[in-house]
Amino acid sequence: MAAPATSVLSRQVRSFSTSVVRPFSKLVRPPVQVYGIEGRYATALYSAASKQKRLDQVEKELLRVGQLLKDPKVSLAVLNPYIKRSIKVKSLKDITTKEKFSPLTANLMNLLAENGRLGNTQGVISAFSTIMSVHRGEVPCTVTTAFPLDEAVLSELKTVLNSFLSKGQILNLEVKTDPSIMGGMIVRIGEKYVDMSAKSKIQKLSKAMRDLL
């Protein structure tokens, strides 16, 4: 059953890609590959928006779409599975017209509605945001500590993390607190992961002790 579903998805994405990229002969590959249904739509949208030099505009519009879908009235009108697809398409057309969205964003939302993929909208927005983050040279970094960091330590941490970046890259840092790690920190930067938490050290010590017994 997976193959037919994949085939249908491929046709849907090609339809979207053709509808928005028709004036151009070549597709623009995104700087990072995103996967799944959402990734395919986001990739096609990135290619089209890049060709038309509307990446920033489309990104802002998609964020606005995300906000609109959090509105209970809008969500009920377009995400309710019991509402006819044709009604959802009409509702979305009214919304995109009212918001004065570009044809790129309007076409995306229309196609998602026609193909019964509106439930994937937030995923498409997230995938597009990931592509745009890499497009801008941003390197995602998450640091988890047991307790909040003071300004001096945070400043020193940023200096150390920035030293690992290449020229033109921008650190996109998110600091979280999780008392369960007990102390130390866990750092995830790009595709690298370093666990320096006290919890991890205790677990390793415990394992080493068991191995000796």
Swiss-Prot record:
- Where are the N6-acetyllysine residues found in this chain? K60, K70, K73, K100, K158, K176, K192
User: What keywords are assigned to this protein?
Assistant: Acetylation, ATP synthesis, Hydrogen ion transport, Ion transport, Membrane, Mitochondrion, Mitochondrion inner membrane, Transit peptide, Transport, Ubl conjugation
Q: Which domain of life is it from?
A: Eukaryota
Question: Where are the N6-succinyllysine residues found in this chain?
Answer: K90, K100, K158, K199
Q: Which InterPro entries match?
A: ATP_synth_OSCP/delta_N_sf (IPR026015), ATPase_OSCP/d_CS (IPR020781), ATPase_OSCP/dsu (IPR000711)
Q: GO cellular-component terms in the record?
A: cell surface; mitochondrial inner membrane; mitochondrion; plasma membrane; proton-transporting ATP synthase complex
Signal peptide (from-to): none
Q: What does the UniProt PTM comment say about this protein? A: In response to mitochondrial stress, the precursor protein is ubiquitinated by the SIFI complex in the cytoplasm before mitochondrial import, leading to its degradation. Within the SIFI complex, UBR4 initiates ubiquitin chain that are further elongated or branched by KCMF1.
Give one GO biological process term. cellular response to cytokine stimulus
| Localization terms from the record | Mitochondrion; Mitochondrion inner membrane
Query: Can you tell me where the transmembrane regions are?
Result: none
Q: Give the stretch annotated as transit peptide in the record, renumbered to this chain.
A: 1-23
Q: In which tissues is it expressed?
A: Expressed by the principal cells of the epididymis. Detected in flagella of epididymal sperm (at protein level).
Q: Where is this motif: SIFI-degron?
A: 5-23
Recorded GO molecular functions are: estradiol binding; protein-containing complex binding; proton-transporting ATP synthase activity, rotational mechanism
Name the Pfam families for this protein: OSCP (PF00213)
List, alphabetically, the PANTHER family matched: ATP SYNTHASE DELTA CHAIN (PTHR11910)
Q: Which NCBIfam families does this entry report, sorted A to Z? A: ATP_synt_delta (TIGR01145)
Q: Which family does it belong to?
A: Belongs to the ATPase delta chain family.
Complexes and interactors: Component of the ATP synthase complex composed at least of ATP5F1A/subunit alpha, ATP5F1B/subunit beta, ATP5MC1/subunit c (homooctomer), MT-ATP6/subunit a, MT-ATP8/subunit 8, ATP5ME/subunit e, ATP5MF/subunit f, ATP5MG/subunit g, ATP5MK/subunit k, ATP5MJ/subunit j, ATP5F1C/subunit gamma, ATP5F1D/subunit delta, ATP5F1E/subunit epsilon, ATP5PF/subunit F6, ATP5PB/subunit b, ATP5PD/subunit d, ATP5PO/subunit OSCP.
- Task performed by this protein: Subunit OSCP, of the mitochondrial membrane ATP synthase complex (F(1)F(0) ATP synthase or Complex V) that produces ATP from ADP in the presence of a proton gradient across the membrane which is generated by electron transport complexes of the respiratory chain. ATP synthase complex consist of a soluble F(1) head domain - the catalytic core - and a membrane F(1) domain - the membrane proton channel. These two domains are linked by a central stalk rotating inside the F(1) region and a stationary peripheral stalk.
This chain's protein is named ATP synthase peripheral stalk subunit OSCP, mitochondrial
> What organism does this protein naturally occur in?
Rattus norvegicus
Its gene name is: Atp5po
